[in-house]
Amino acid sequence: MTGRKEEELEGVTLLGNQGTTYTFDYNPDILEVFENKHQGRDYFVKFNCPEFTTLCPMTGQPDFATVYISYIPDVKMVESKSLKLYLFSFRNHGDFHEDAMNIIMNDLIKLMDPRYIEVWGKFTPRGGISIDPYTNYGRPGTKYEKMAEYRMMNHDLYPETVDNR
């Protein structure tokens, strides 16, 4: 197997950049992609993001979560450093938990057009309650549409032990 050629990495500008700028305001333009070299195969790419923060739109108080992103790529894949910076850009963004997870998923669909994607936010309790929004998408008219329906119906069938994180 050979490594990636320089021209395959033209759109990847943040990885390896020592002068990284952290944006504190929501910015989907930070996201970068590269080509999937294994388009003939279905496989999951999973990201665990344990330090996600956003703001409550009513009180301005911070909300903390672990965000799980899993997707089956088609042609394009999200570059991980750009994803990290994108998620960091939610730091001063005020939205409800459910909205934030759907915004993330919609931005990634627009960026990559994956075969399948799911985004799950596990927020720490605030006011005595934790909220864990789950959202997913399967490309319409394909087996991934049925997969999304199945995973939606079964995603929390055997929930983990809640330990107040």
Curated annotation (Swiss-Prot):
The keyword Secreted does not apply. It is found in: Cytoplasm. InterPro entries: GTP-CH-I_C/QueF, NADPH_dep_7-cyano-7-deazaG_red, QueF, QueF_type1. The keyword Cytoplasm applies. Substrate binds at V78, E79, S80, H97, E98. Catalyzes the NADPH-dependent reduction of 7-cyano-7-deazaguanine (preQ0) to 7-aminomethyl-7-deazaguanine (preQ1). Belongs to the GTP cyclohydrolase I family. QueF type 1 subfamily. This is NADPH-dependent 7-cyano-7-deazaguanine reductase. It comes from Halalkalibacterium halodurans (strain ATCC BAA-125 / DSM 18197 / FERM 7344 / JCM 9153 / C-125) (Bacillus halodurans). The gene is queF.
